[in-house]
Amino acid sequence: MLGWALIFLIVAIIAGTLGFSGVAGAASWIAQVLFLVFLALLVISLLGGRRV
């Protein structure tokens, strides 16, 4: 999931430099959402991990 966030971030940067502001905005929003989902799942897995 973190890989997808990085891909959308790169797409947003490239689209922004080429002048496609709509595509850049959408790609950066998707990258932010995926990164937040990744962080939430990371915290949940750390807190709810199995303890022996």
Curated annotation (Swiss-Prot):
One of its GO terms (cellular component) is plasma membrane. It is found in: Cell membrane. It is a multi-pass membrane protein. It comes from the Bacteria. InterPro entries: DUF1328. Keywords: Cell membrane, Membrane, Transmembrane, Transmembrane helix. The chain crosses the membrane at residues 4-24, 29-49. Belongs to the UPF0391 family. This is UPF0391 membrane protein Tgr7_2500. It comes from Thioalkalivibrio sulfidiphilus (strain HL-EbGR7).
